[in-house]
Amino acid sequence: MMECFSKITSANAAFVVRVYVVEPQPGTAFNVGANSFGHVAISLSKTSGSTTITQTVGFYPTGSGLDRLSSKSQILDNGDIEYGIGATYYVTGESFQKVINYVANPPANYHFTDFNCSAFVYGAGQAGSVPIPDPTAVIGLGFGKTPAGMASALRDQKAKNPNLDINEGGGRIPGSNGPCKIE
């Protein structure tokens, strides 16, 4: 899904990384709620002239039932889903490529507390030096990277710098370009 970006020249292109969060219980620190455990997706956009390619993906388990808690991982298209809070980061071409490389080569395994969608998006940001905040939150007696933690960290980021492009009003994620179709 990431090969699409090479179809647009990088000279004079604009590069954007977005984070979208579906909170488990919107506006709270609860790690389980109406939206189950919640979800965090990452969106990558490259624009040159009038051509834009956007891919929005999420990191998921392949298992079902209780096997979903710890299984092999998969990357799925996350375009066209509702989200509660989102953040936009304008990055360099070099940072963008590092994020693409990370997303295109995801960790082989998913674990609901040790390496989940929140940890994946945070890791992608770290790979490209994108200031996506650390989504670590309390889980029972321990800690883990969670969608609720990401939402809280984004709100904290916005409180510290009101000029950041963080949308607390939610909305619908635009559709992805899918398997490398330029529109």
Give the ranges of each region predicted by the language model:
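Non-catalytic ligand/cofactor/substrate-binding and regulatory segments of enzyme domains
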Residues: 2-117, 126-183
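Conserved catalytic core of nucleotide polymerization and phosphodiester-bond processing enzymes
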Residues: 121
